[in-house]
């Protein structure tokens, strides 16, 4: 596992030379005129346009959770830099103390449908490495009707979860 300073860079440092980074939301596109309009009212003409629609997580829409309190206690999210760090710290503690680990995914598969499975498997691995596996019950709950939405990989994933005694529940 990498340290935060080994994997994070300011976004501006990641852009190729000659790329103009517009830090605003596109609210209208006119592909015929090759124009984009932003929420801030700017219009851009383009010959070639790359849109990178981001994902905005609205914690205020989840009852009982806010961005500020996420990671306090036992509710964690791996989909942002700060949340991933808090999750790693919590996993270190959990795999030392033991208990019941409940891992979930979402119906929409948020940024990456495989990420929650990786975190569950990482936690299980840590517990084996620490010699605490027998003190932990792992459960993985899926909102959909399968562990993974890529049928080619689902049988092998189910086999791995079974081999590691991780209970899987599908909707």
Please give the residue ranges for each predicted region.
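Hydrophobic/aromatic beta-strand patches that form the interior of the parallel beta-sheet core
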Residues: 22, 50, 102, 139-141, ...
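Short, well-ordered coil/turn residues at beta-beta hairpins
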Residues: 39, 52-53, 61
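Short active-site-adjacent helix-start/loop capping segments
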Residues: 29-31, 45, 58-60, 111-112
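Flexible loop residues that form catalytic
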Residues: 41, 54, 106
């Amino acid at each position: 596992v990498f340290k935060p300073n080994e994997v994070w860079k300011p976004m501006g440092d990641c852009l190729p030379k000659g790329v103009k980074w517009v830090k605003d939301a596109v609210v209208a596109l006119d592909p015929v005129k090759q124009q984009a309009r932003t929420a801030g009212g700017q219009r851009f003409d383009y010959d070639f346009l790359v849109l990178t629609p981001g994902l905005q997580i609205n914690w205020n829409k989840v009852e009982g959770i806010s961005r500020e309190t996420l990671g306090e206690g036992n509710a964690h999210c791996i989909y942002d830099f700060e949340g991933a760090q808090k999750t790693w710290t919590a996993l270190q503690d959990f795999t030392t103390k033991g208990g019941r680990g409940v891992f979930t995914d979402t119906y929409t598969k948020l940024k990456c449908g495989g990420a929650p499975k990786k975190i569950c498997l990482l936690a299980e691995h840590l517990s084996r490495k620490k010699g605490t596996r027998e003190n932990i019950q792992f459960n993985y709950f899926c909102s959909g009707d399968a562990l993974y939405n890529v049928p080619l990989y689902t049988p092998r994933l189910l086999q791995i979860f079974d081999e590691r005694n991780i209970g899987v529940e599908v909707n």
